[in-house]
């Protein structure tokens, strides 16, 4: 049990919230069921006492200040696409939704930055930047997450292999601290050596240290040419073993994804389209790499395609299929983008992990993971970012009793996380810890690092009101 005691929201406080955010305060059963859980419902449901739909930094600050003074838990909420229970108000209290803070505030093209409110959807920012001839490189699979949520988990996505993760594109932010104070961290400039980086501490903190309300993000000139390759293999081992060759030959893929045939077939059925071949010249396909390259000209990409084709065919690929039309490229990536959605649609009980391991350990790690499937009553499906070792592994069942499913999954996850740690990996590459992975984080990092994290949390949030029960602070 927590040593911190929280209070219930009173009618008087509700009236004050309504003064702060007129007609945007919901109470009790007025709050939609969607606000009780995120996309991974296996981590439980909890309804906040009050939901406030904020439209400005000042509103967020006023609500948080009132909650801090009265020791009321506060849970920040974006598009609720998380997978670890990070936006579930397990402590009750007040939930602050940031989805109405969805304005793109403007571009500074001379300094290649864009300023936005944190509730802007990733898809909206990507499309708007494209109209400006710019690219916002972070490209997580869930395009309808908020950018603030991406920052809160340091999401990576498909283009991380070349361009890095969300952290690499955050120049500055406006944050409401747990006390209700408003601070601006970072600056438009590209480098700094100015004391502790509170900006970087906030990135990946999952709403436990502050609520991000505005962001200044780095953008880059959009590449002039982009092309994708579908590369089929007879088996997953050969597929993954090819990955280091891309980097040894300086091919610099913009994205490099692996997918198992079963997962691809299920997704194509879900989407009602067939894109990926299942057999070529009598050879059954078992897995695929989906690679994208970008450059300044079509001629440059033609050279890259020729070299990449030689490399992968020599390494065991069955063939190389060029997605040489916009429609085929769109369809190929639509399948990749819908993998999780298809798994969710066909699964009653679902859990996941997104471990990250050194790239030279991917094949061995996935082979080990698949070997564990024989010991369980659930199915194991996987896909992920082959280029940086971030693997998405899902346990799926349609006929197990929930208690037994959770019991078996716990055994499976214990082994998976232990192996990832043994290989020099980490337990989460981009989905975060939330409250679903706290025990695994503690076991992976050990008591010294956890004690430091707890100390950081206490400095920012003395009353422990902000997103309690997540990362390092248990309820």
UniProtKB/Swiss-Prot annotation:
Its EC number is 1.1.99.6. It holds the Pfam family FAD_binding_4. PROSITE patterns: FAD_PCMH. Its cofactor is FAD; Zn(2+). It catalyses: (R)-lactate + A = pyruvate + AH2. Keywords: FAD, Flavoprotein, Oxidoreductase, Zinc. One of its GO terms (molecular function) is FAD binding. Binds 1 FAD non-covalently per subunit. Binds 1 Zn(2+) ion per subunit. This is D-lactate dehydrogenase. The lineage of its organism: Bacteria, Bacillati, Bacillota, Clostridia, Lachnospirales.
């Amino acid at each position: 049990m927590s040593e911190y005691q929280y209070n219930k929201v009173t009618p008087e406080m509700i009236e004050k919230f309504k003064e702060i955010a007129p007609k945007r305060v919901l109470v009790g059963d007025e709050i939609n069921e969607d606000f009780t859980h995120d996309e991974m419902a296996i981590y439980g449901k909890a309804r906040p006492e009050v939901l406030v739909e904020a439209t400005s930094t000042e509103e967020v600050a006023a609500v948080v200040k009132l909650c801090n003074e009265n020791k009321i838990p506060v849970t920040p909420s974006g598009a609720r696409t998380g997978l670890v229970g990070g936006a579930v108000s397990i402590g009750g209290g007040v939930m602050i939704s940031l989805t109405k803070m969805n304005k793109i505030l403007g571009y500074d093209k001379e300094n290649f930055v864009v300023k936005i409110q944190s509730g802007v959807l990733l898809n909206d920012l990507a499309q708007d930047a494209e109209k400006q001839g710019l690219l916002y490189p972070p490209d997580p699979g869930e395009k309808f997450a908020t950018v603030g949520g991406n920052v809160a988990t340091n999401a990576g996505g498909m283009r991380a292999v070349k361009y890095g993760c969300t952290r690499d594109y955050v120049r500055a932010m406006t944050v409401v601290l747990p006390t209700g104070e408003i601070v601006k961290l970072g600056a438009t400039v590209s480098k700094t050596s100015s004391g502790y980086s509170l900006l970087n501490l906030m990135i990946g903190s999952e709403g436990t240290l502050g609520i991000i309300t505005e962001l200044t993000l780095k953008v880059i000139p959009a590449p002039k040419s982009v092309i994708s390759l579908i590369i089929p293999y007879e088996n997953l081992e050969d597929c993954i073993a090819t990955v280091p060759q891309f980097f040894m030959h300086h091919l610099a893929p913009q994205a490099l994804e692996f997918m198992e045939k079963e997962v691809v077939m299920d997704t194509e059925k879900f989407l009602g389209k067939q894109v990926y071949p299942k057999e070529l010249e009598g050879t059954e396909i078992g897995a695929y790499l989906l690679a994208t390259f970008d450059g300044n000209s079509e001629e440059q990409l033609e050279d890259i395609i020729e070299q990449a084709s030689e490399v992968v065919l020599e390494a065991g690929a069955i063939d190389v299929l060029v997605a040489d039309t916009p429609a085929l490229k769109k369809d190929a990536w639509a399948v990749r983008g819908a993998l999780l959605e298809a798994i969710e649609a066909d699964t009653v009980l679902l859990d996941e992990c997104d471990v990250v391991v050194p790239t030279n350990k991917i094949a061995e790690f996935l082979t080990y993971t698949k070997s564990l499937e024989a010991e369980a009553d659930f199915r194991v499906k996987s896909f992920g970012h082959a280029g940086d070792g971030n693997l998405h592994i899902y346990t799926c069942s349609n006929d197990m009793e929930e208690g037994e499913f959770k019991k078996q999954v716990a055994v499976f996850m214990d082994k998976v996380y232990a192996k990832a740690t043994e290989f020099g990996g980490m337990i989460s590459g981009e989905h975060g810890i939330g409250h679903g992975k706290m025990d695994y984080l503690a076991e992976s990092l050990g008591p010294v690092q956890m004690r430091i994290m707890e100390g950081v949390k206490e400095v920012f949030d003395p009353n422990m009101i902000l997103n309690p029960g997540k990362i390092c602070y248990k309820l």
